[in-house]
Amino acid sequence: MIENKYYLEDYESISEEVKHLTNSLSRLKVLATLYEHPKSMKDLTADTGLSYSSVSSTMHKLELKGYIYRESSKYYLSNCMRLKIETILELNEIINTLNKFFNILDKHLVGVIPNESVAELYLIGQANLIESRDIEAYRIYNYIEQILNQANEVKCILPFYYENFNRQLDGLIENKIDVEAIVSDNILNIFENESKIENLSSFSQNKNFLLIITDEVMVLGLFKEDGYFDQNRLLISKNEDAINWAVNLFENFKNRNK
C-alpha cells in the first residue's frame, strides 16, 4: 500500500535477500514452520499443507544457501536465518501498526520522530486511538489531565503551553513527584517564568509532537501537515512495551537536541 511505502522510507533499506525470502508462499510457509520448531520432511509436508515435491524443492534451495541445515532426520534454521525471520516479523508488525493508526499518521508530521523509534513502531501495536468530535472538542485534553492527576512520575515533550497541564505538573512537583519536560524553544521563556519544572530543556520549534509518559501510560499526539496540532486524535497505551517505546523516544529525542 502507498501509505506503507511512505512511512517505511526511514526504515533503512531491506536487503534483497530478505525480499527474496518473502516473495514465495511455499518458502515463507516452510521458514515460518521451522521458526517454531525443527521438523522432519514428513512433518513439514503435513504442517504446511504443501505437496512433498514442493517442500522438497524448497528445502533443497534453502539448504544450498545455508539458510537451513539437517541434523539426523530434522531440519533446523541457521542462526542468521532466524535473525532474518525476526526482522520480517517485525516489519509485518510495523505494517499492521501503520494500517491500524492510519488516521493519525496520514497527513501528519511523522518525520520528526527519530528513525530509531520509527524502526520499533511495532512495539505500540496494542495502543488505542482516541478520537474526538466537535461536540467533545476537549476530550483529549481532559484525558491528559486525568492521567497527569494519577501520575507518580512524568516525562513529557511539550510543543505548546497549556495552562491546565502546567498547573497539574506544578501540583505533581509540589507533591515531590519527578517531572522532566522538553519544550519547544519558542515557549521556553513561558515555562521558565510560569512553571515550577526544574528539569527543563528545549528543542527547535519545527520538531513538533506531543509525548507524555507516566508510570502507567504513554500518550502521543501529532501535528498536521498544516502546522496545527491535531486536537482530535491521540495514541494512548498502558502496555509495557509501548511505555518503554515512548521512554526510548523521549531519550532519543533529548539526545538529538542536546
Give names to the regions the model predicted:
Residues I2-E36, D43, D47-R70, L89, ...:
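PLD/PLD-like phosphodiesterase catalytic module centered on the HKD motif
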Residues S15, F101-E180:
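PLD-like (HKD) phosphodiesterase/transphosphatidyltransferase domain
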Residues H37-P38, K74:
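Residue at a beta-strand N-cap/secondary-structure junction
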Residues S40, Q126, S132-A137, N232-N239:
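Intrinsic-disorder/low-complexity, polar/charged segments
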Residues R70-N92:
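Basic, amphipathic "hinge/linker" alpha-helix immediately C-terminal to the N-terminal HTH DNA-binding motif
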